[in-house]
């Protein structure tokens, strides 16, 4: 049986080595997030200040996988 994951939205606050990021969730929690393989394969750039969707395990709520970078409303891309 597959483990249930919780999906949250948050803001990248800090970039760490090896594709890791500090993410502040909308509920105020700080989570250590790593980039999913699909984002890495598509060469999607994630920078501090970006809004992302992050998948967090129910068993370890301090780490998560970044699964989507949300588009900024004011950007031209």
Curated annotation (Swiss-Prot):
Function (record text): One of the essential components for the initiation of protein synthesis. Stabilizes the binding of IF-2 and IF-3 on the 30S subunit to which N-formylmethionyl-tRNA(fMet) subsequently binds. Helps modulate mRNA selection, yielding the 30S pre-initiation complex (PIC). Upon addition of the 50S ribosomal subunit IF-1, IF-2 and IF-3 are released leaving the mature 70S translation initiation complex.
Self-association state and partner proteins as the record states: Component of the 30S ribosomal translation pre-initiation complex which assembles on the 30S ribosome in the order IF-2 and IF-3, IF-1 and N-formylmethionyl-tRNA(fMet); mRNA recruitment can occur at any time during PIC assembly.
HAMAP family: IF_1
Family: Belongs to the IF-1 family.
Organism: Amborella trichopoda
Segments forming domain S1-like: 1-71
Name by which UniProt lists this protein: Translation initiation factor IF-1, chloroplastic
InterPro entries in the cross-refs: NA-bd_OB-fold, RNA-binding_domain_S1_IF1, S1_domain, TIF_IF1
Origin: domain of life: Eukaryota
Pfam family, one: eIF-1a
NCBIfam families per the UniProt record, alphabetical: infA
């Amino acid at each position: 049986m597959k483990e249930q994951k919780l999906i949250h939205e948050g803001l990248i606050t800090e970039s760490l080595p090896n594709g890791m990021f500090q993410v502040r969730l909308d509920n105020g929690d700080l989570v250590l997030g790593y980039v999913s393989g699909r984002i890495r394969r598509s060469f999607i750039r994630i920078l501090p200040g970006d809004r992302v969707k992050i998948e967090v395990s129910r068993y370890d709520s301090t780490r998560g996988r970044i699964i989507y970078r949300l588009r900024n409303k004011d950007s031209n891309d």
